[in-house]
Design a protein with these regions (language model features):
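Short, low-complexity disordered leader/linker segments with a strong preference
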Residues: 1-33, 146, 330-331
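N-terminal (or domain-start) structured segment
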Residues: 25-120, 158-160, 182-208, 219, ...
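An extracytoplasmic/periplasmic, membrane-proximal ligand-sensing/linker region
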Residues: 33-35, 179-183, 247, 269-331
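Stable alpha-helical elements in mature extracytoplasmic
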Residues: 47, 51, 55, 59, ...
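Hinge/capping helix and adjacent helix->loop/strand transition within the periplasmic-binding protein
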Residues: 83-92, 99, 107-196, 245, ...
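A ligand-binding cleft/hinge motif common to bilobed small-molecule-binding domains
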Residues: 100-111, 171, 176-180, 208-242
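Short, charged, surface-exposed secondary-structure boundary motifs
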Residues: 196-198, 237-241, 311
């Protein structure tokens, strides 16, 4: 006669012994031995797709197997995000994600997402950062952050801003700025992103926006938009005379939008480390840096997968506080 639960405890003990052995055996196998799928959460042509298509051939060259880009657009990136989170943790399904998909969506889509990126994905490395710029319509009188705040306080209820939609980081960044500055701003979302935001800004229908530099640089240079500040820690070479948000008294306001490579959370560490090393080698090549610089992207590889994973978790927590404090919710 066995005491109650003995068989169950024995079974659990066997599983506890076998799982590490299975993981060790899997990680000891050569990797990769077949093509690797690289999920992109947006349609072709955007920044996330561009970096994925630049890095994939270099990973193929380094690791000897094809890295195939697979665009899974839709649901603000959540379709690809959830596909990656639910994939087998064997290194054969990766995700190129960004600050929106991997640090913000977990809070803004909390009631509808079936996965939690901070729990269900592991970071391999940050790839690039994309500078953003705080822009204004040419017809808007202020030229600095301080002047913008002064104008807003003298004209309550008259200052509005564009974003790519509720819960996007241009929206959340402006909420953070308004709170820090003690001003009120009216949000006008454009689901078409920069394609709709730019005409609205240039016509003066809206006065302000945080938007990526690549989308606005030509309009700024042509005098159709006004650059008030940039969001990187230091001034960007393309706009050397435009001070940063930090220089104007608002450090940490405005996102340095990053793109990064992720894998399912239980992917063996040797595979994650091997991918990280390949990414570092690929993005250290001068031709890659030059190619990405032409797209106004700055190479920004992480020191280690652990560092990147921790960065994303820290940012996820910070964005969750912004979302909670401003009662931003998407059902």
């Amino acid at each position: 006669f066995d005491p109650p639960g003995t068989m169950r405890r024995l079974a659990l003990a066997v599983v506890a012994v076998l799982l590490p052995l299975a993981a060790a055996a899997q990680s000891a196998e050569p990797y990769p031995t077949r093509p690797v799928k690289v999920l992109v959460p947006y349609a072709p042509g955007g920044a996330t797709d561009i970096i994925a298509r630049h890095i994939a051939p270099k990973l193929q060259e380094a690791l000897g197997q094809a890295f195939v880009v697979d665009n899974r657009a839709g649901a603000s990136g959540n379709i690809a995000l959830e596909a990656a989170a639910k994939a087998a943790p064997d290194g054969y399904t990766l995700l190129v994600g960004n600050v929106s998909t991997n640090a913000i969506n977990e809070s803004t889509f909390a009631t509808v997402m079936q996965t939690r990126p901070s729990r269900d994905l592991v970071g391999i490395s940050k790839l690039v950062e994309i500078p953003h710029v705080f822009v204004a319509a040419i017809s808007f009188p202020p030229n600095t952050v301080a002047e913008t705040i002064e104008w807003a306080k003298k004209n309550p209820g008259k200052l509005n801003y564009a974003s790519a939609g509720l819960g996007t980081y241009p929206h959340l960044d402006m909420l953070r700025f308004a709170k820090a500055a003690g001003i009120e701003l009216t949000h006008i979302p454009y689901k078409g992103g920069a394609a709709q935001m730019l005409p609205a800004l240039m016509s003066g229908d809206v006065q302000l926006a945080f938007i990526n530099l690549a989308s606005t640089i030509e309009q700024i240079r042509a005098g159709r938009l006004k650059a008030i500040a940039t969001t990187m820690p230091t001034r960007v070479p393309e706009l050397p005379n435009v001070p940063t948000m930090a220089e104007q008294g608002f450090p940490g306001i405005g996102t340095n939008a990053w793109q990064g490579l992720f894998a399912p959370a239980a992917t063996p560490k040797p595979i994650v480390d091997k991918l990280h090393a390949a990414v570092v080698a690929a993005l250290s090549r001068p031709e890659m840096k030059e190619m990405l610089a032409q797209q106004l992207m700055t190479v920004a590889v992480s020191k280690s997968p652990q560092d990147f994973t921790e960065q994303v978790r820290t940012e996820t927590q910070a964005w969750s506080e912004v979302v909670r404090d401003n009662k931003v919710k998407i059902d």
